[in-house]
Amino acid sequence: MTPGAAGRASFGQSAASASSLKWAALQDAAKVVAGLAGLEPERTTPEIRNFPALIRDTAPWRRELAERGIDDMAAVMEPGIAALLGVNARGADPRAAALTLWREFTHARAAVLALLPPSGAMGPRRSA
């Protein structure tokens, strides 16, 4: 364990694995929200699917911001989905609230994805 930014501990590979799991869980949660909003299922782009691996190879400041963004998205999505499921269970229409949560999520996800450096026509930079 090494000290991270702002007094947070950085656990190296295990932190990357935890972020990867959170990222995948967020994408699954987004599918639920989209369904409750009445939207068609979103196609997962390579950028979204490969984000954890791509961000792992970037500068530490990008990884730290991505981890914070992922944590922030989870902090919004968890209670949001719980509320939407509660509304749906009572027989009320959750579409308007779900659409609002969906838009909030997609904007936050776009901001996190923007942390990836440009990859160019040859794909992301790789180093041995």
Briefly describe each language-model feature range.
Residues 2, 37-40, 51, 59, ...:
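Intrinsic-disorder/low-complexity coil detector
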Residues 82-128:
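Amphipathic alpha-helical binding modules
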Residues 7-10, 15, 38-41, 72, ...:
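Polar low-complexity intrinsically disordered regions enriched in Ser/Thr and small residues
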Residues 16-26, 41, 45-48, 67, ...:
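Alpha-solenoid helical-repeat scaffolds
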Residues 1-55, 106-109:
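Short terminal alpha-helical segments
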Residues 31-86:
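Amphipathic alpha-helical interaction modules
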